[in-house]
């Protein structure tokens, strides 16, 4: 199954964003961002059932970007948060995560809310929030996803500032 040019361009943009911050992604065999002749890709490496290409950024935070044919992509952060991001903002969201421009937004308040979170095995019930855009006069866009705590807790996620 061939990889379309938009997906190829997205892989290239992700590679550039990661390289700018010293975190180039793992090689993507089905979409070599530097080989213009590789637009057709490799059917073996591509998830043909869902038509997706995965781009992995090792380190902290650990990021896995799933590029889907329809352009509605997903960024998985530290294996506990999924952000649904349209293709136009994908590289900006990844770059914001790589440089630490993300925040946690508490989803409960007060002693009882936090106690309930602890009892339900989520000691810090919150959403991960990433804001992008707005620099060029356009309205900033916000992407968020629930922080689903799993053992072991992510030190990177827990160290993020909390929104007021």
Describe the function of each predicted region:
Residues 2-5, 9, 81, 85-89, ...:
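Alpha-helix boundary/N-cap detector
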């Amino acid at each position: 199954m061939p990889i379309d040019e938009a997906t190829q361009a997205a892989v290239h943009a992700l590679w550039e964003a990661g390289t700018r911050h010293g975190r180039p992604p793992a090689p993507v065999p089905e979409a070599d961002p530097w080989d213009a002749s590789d637009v057709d890709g490799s059917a073996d490496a591509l998830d043909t059932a869902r038509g997706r290409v995965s781009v992995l950024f090792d380190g902290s935070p650990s990021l896995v970007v799933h590029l889907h044919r329809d352009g509605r992509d997903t960024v998985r952060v530290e294996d506990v948060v999924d952000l649904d991001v349209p293709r136009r903002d994908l590289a900006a969201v990844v770059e914001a995560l790589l440089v630490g421009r993300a925040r946690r937004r508490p989803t409960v308040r007060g002693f009882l809310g936090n106690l309930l979170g602890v009892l339900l095995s989520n000691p810090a019930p919150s959403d991960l929030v990433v804001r992008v855009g707005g620099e060029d006069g356009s309205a900033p866009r916000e992407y968020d996803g629930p922080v689903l705590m799993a053992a072991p807790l992510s030190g990177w996620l827990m160290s993020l500032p909390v929104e007021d």
